[in-house]
C-alpha cells in the first residue's frame, strides 16, 4: 500500500464511524449536491428587502465556509469577503444592482459552476441582443472567429476582423469590467464565460469600430 499504516488506520476509523443518519438540516441530492432541507423560504421577490438580502448573504457565506472544500485555497480570505459584501448587499439600490452584486459574490469562488442564472442580468444589465458572429480573445485582441448564421450575414463584417470598440467603449475596458463579476478557474474558462456577455446589448442596434487588414 502507498498509504502509511497510521494514516490508513485513521482514515479507516473515520470511515467506520461515519454518520449514516439523515440530517434534519442537510442531505445530498442524487447527484451529490447539497440540499438544505429546512431553510425557511421567503418571497420570490426579485429585489427583497434589506434584511432578507443580508440573510441571503449570510446563508451563502455559511455554505461556502462549512462545505466548500477549496475555501482555504481561494484567492481572497473568505472572512474578508463577508465584510466586503455586507455593505454591497445592504446598499443595493435596485434589482439590477442587487443581482449584479450576487453574481460578483459568486465570482469569488473562481468557479464557472457558481454563476448566477438571472433574467434580470440578461435583460436589464447585459441585454439579450447579440451580433451574428462569435469572437475569440487572442493576446488582448478580439477577433471575429465565426459568422453564426450565413443567411443573416449582411457582409459588413468578416472573419478575421478585429473589434476595437462597441458603442464607443473600448472592448478591452468592457472585458475588464465584466471580469470583475465573472471569474473562472483559469483564463480560458473565464473567456468562455465572459465572451457571450461581451457583445450583449440592451438595444437591437450597436456601433462597432473594427480593424481590417491593418486599417
Please give the residue ranges for each predicted region.
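Flexible, low-complexity junctional segments that flank or bridge functional domains
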Residues: 1-215
Amino acid at each position: 500500500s502507498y498509504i502509511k499504516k497510521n494514516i490508513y488506520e485513521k482514515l479507516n476509523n473515520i470511515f467506520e464511524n461515519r454518520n449514516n443518519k439523515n440530517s434534519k438540516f442537510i442531505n445530498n441530492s442524487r447527484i451529490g449536491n447539497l440540499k438544505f432541507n429546512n431553510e425557511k423560504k421567503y418571497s420570490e421577490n426579485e429585489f427583497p428587502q434589506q434584511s432578507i438580502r443580508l440573510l441571503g448573504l449570510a446563508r451563502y457565506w455559511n455554505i461556502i465556509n462549512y462545505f466548500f472544500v477549496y475555501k482555504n485555497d481561494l484567492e481572497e480570505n473568505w472572512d474578508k469577503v463577508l465584510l466586503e459584501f455586507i455593505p454591497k448587499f445592504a446598499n443595493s439600490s435596485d434589482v439590477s444592482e442587487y443581482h449584479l452584486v450576487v453574481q460578483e459574490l459568486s465570482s469569488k469562488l473562481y468557479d464557472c459552476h457558481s454563476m448566477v442564472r438571472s433574467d434580470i442580468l440578461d435583460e436589464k444589465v447585459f441585454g439579450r441582443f447579440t451580433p451574428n458572429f462569435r469572437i475569440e480573445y487572442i493576446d488582448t485582441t478580439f477577433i471575429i472567429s465565426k459568422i453564426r448564421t450565413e443567411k443573416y450575414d449582411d457582409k459588413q463584417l468578416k472573419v478575421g476582423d478585429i473589434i476595437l470598440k462597441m458603442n464607443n467603449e473600448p472592448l478591452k475596458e468592457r472585458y475588464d469590467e465584466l471580469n470583475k463579476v465573472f471569474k473562472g478557474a483559469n483564463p480560458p474558462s473565464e473567456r468562455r464565460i465572459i465572451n457571450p456577455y461581451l457583445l450583449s446589448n440592451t438595444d437591437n442596434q450597436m456601433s462597432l469600430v473594427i480593424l481590417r487588414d491593418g486599417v
